[in-house]
Amino acid sequence: QYLALQKYLGLDNLFCIPAGFERLPAIDRYFDLVFCMGILYHRKSPVEMLAGIQQMIRPGGMLVLDNLVLESSHGMCLFPESRYAKMRNVFFIPDLKCMESWLLRAGFSSVSCVDVTKTTKEEQRKTDWIQTESLADFLDPADPDRTVEGYPAPVRAVFTACA
């Protein structure tokens, strides 16, 4: 994702840190903008990670967060028993209100959900570069609105929030 952005934007002040969040040094109030894309649901402590990200962003800076969500607003979260869409490393899938609460609790303000999109088989499919299983293999063949484990099919949301 970073290389695609850099190719088209060509900015010399845009960079990617290819490291796990816990391996980053303490960076206090440094970044103007942080993208957290498809990572949070893999974390065992998502609110702690959000609080850590919030500490890295300058006052007035922004977080852009892409995450799996449930399409409801009850303030609840799915904790898959063992797997979600055949992935063992998915721990928490919040609904929209729950994600907003997590962001506020982590110290962010002006939280906004700017997009909610169901993941499609066209978007995540086998290609010449990736021949492994794809979304079609992760969904219930009898009910494509469910994963093979019986959970709601993947829906992604993008949130913005100010530090």
What are these regions (language model features)?
Residues 1-23:
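Class I SAM-dependent methyltransferase SAM/SAH-binding core
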Residues 22-34:
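A short acidic, Gly/Pro-enriched loop at the edge of an enzyme's catalytic core
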Residues 31-46:
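A short SAM/SAH-binding and catalytic strip from SAM-dependent methyltransferases
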Residues 47-62:
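A short glycine-rich, Lys/Arg-flanked "PGG" loop and its adjoining helix->strand segment in the class I
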Residues 65-67:
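Acidic carboxylate diad motif detector
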Residues 69-90:
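Short, glycine-/aromatic-enriched active-site segment of Class I SAM-dependent methyltransferases
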Residues 90-113:
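Short alpha-helix
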Residues 109-138:
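Conserved catalytic loop of SAM-dependent methyltransferase domains
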